[in-house]
A protein has these predicted regions:
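A generic structural signal for short
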Residues: 1, 33-34, 76-77, 114-115, ...
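N-terminal pre-domain/capping segments
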Residues: 1-93, 149, 157, 186, ...
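Active-site-proximal loop/turn and secondary-structure-junction residues that shape catalytic pockets
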Residues: 3, 27-29, 62-65, 104-108, ...
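Histidine-acidic metal/acid-base catalytic patches
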Residues: 5-19, 148-160, 164, 170-265
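Active-site acidic/histidine proton-transfer and metal-coordination neighborhood
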Residues: 8-11, 50-52, 66-161, 171, ...
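Hydrophobic faces of well-ordered beta-strands that scaffold small-molecule active sites
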Residues: 23-25, 56-61, 100-102, 137-139, ...
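A short acidic, helix-capping loop that chelates divalent metal ions and anchors anionic groups
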Residues: 30-33, 65-72, 106-112, 170-172, ...
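Charged helix-capping and loop-helix junction motifs
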Residues: 37-43, 78, 82-85, 113-123, ...
Length: 265
């Protein structure tokens, strides 16, 4: 919901009125003491999601983009990364959210072998802890196919999966996203859908950017690899919110594209 024009439970209610069936929410930042970990906030989200008929599909531990899993376990950032992720697991368990997403971007990007080892070490621990809750731990990253398979082999947990993204691989290193998905689809749990151009994240409506979204969508259809398809275009900020006076119209446009591409009624 972080790119949706309306925020919080108001955004959840609006999404329900627009016809969305599910939504991924965020744990919130370390600096704000992880707002979604507050039981009153959790109760409000659960009540609204039930009223609107929206499934809470995943909880993103977004602070990992500032305090990454790639940092050593005994470093300040590494400790914050692990602590916040554990709070994410507890929060998801209380809210009956089946997936906790662990992003590896910005400060948490996996660029070196040490980054890789540090990230795998923490994810393996979190997967073991998530088993008691019946929760899936999903990594979102831009590793190569080879390194992604190596990560799955090293972590070796049945509840470890991949949160795929339709733009990030192309944005990070110009990869053929459709081909990456063809090779990794057995490991995919959910998929973020966004597009862009000129090397800018989420800067185009679906199918109008340079990431060959329609080719990726074709692979999604052929493999039926994801339990959920989640809109992740940033409708609430430039450049997308400059395209229309009402950003919700942009959301409706992408919804129409998805229904057409995936032949949804």
């Amino acid at each position: 919901m972080w790119g949706f024009p309306e925020k919080g439970v108001l955004g959840l209610r609006t999404a329900g009125e627009m016809g969305f069936q599910g939504a991924e929410i965020s744990l919130g930042s370390f600096e704000e003491h992880y707002p979604m970990s507050d039981e009153n906030v959790q109760r409000e989200y659960r009540e609204i999601s039930r009223e609107c008929g929206i499934t809470l599909t995943a909880l993103s531990v977004e602070h990992l983009n500032q305090y990454g899993l790639s940092h050593p376990m005994n470093s300040r950032r590494g400790k914050i990364a692990l602590e916040g992720s554990r709070i994410g697991l507890e929060t998801a368990a209380r809210m009956d959210i089946p997936v906790v997403q662990l992003p590896s971007f910005n400060s948490g990007a996996i660029r070196t072998e040490e980054d890789f080892e540090n990230t795998c070490e923490k994810i393996a621990l979190l997967c073991e802890e998530a088993e008691q809750y019946g929760i899936i731990v999903a990594s979102e990253n831009t590793l190569s196919v080879e390194d992604t398979l190596r990560m799955f082999g090293k972590i070796g947990c049945k509840n470890f999966r991949l949160m795929f993204d339709s733009q990030n691989y192309f944005l990070d290193h110009g990869a053929d996203t459709a081909q990456v998905l063809r090779e990794l689809y057995p490991y995919v749990e959910q998929i973020h859908l966004k597009d862009g151009y000129n090397g800018q994240i989420s800067s185009a409506l679906l199918g109008r950017g340079e990431t060959h979204f329609l080719q990726t969508a074709r692979v999604i259809r052929e493999t039926a690899c994801a339990r959920w398809l989640l809109l992740e275009n940033y409708y609430d900020r430039p450049p997308l919110n400059q395209l229309c006076a009402d950003p919700l119209e942009l959301v409706r446009t992408d919804m129409k594209t998805i229904k057409t591409v995936f032949e949804m009624q």
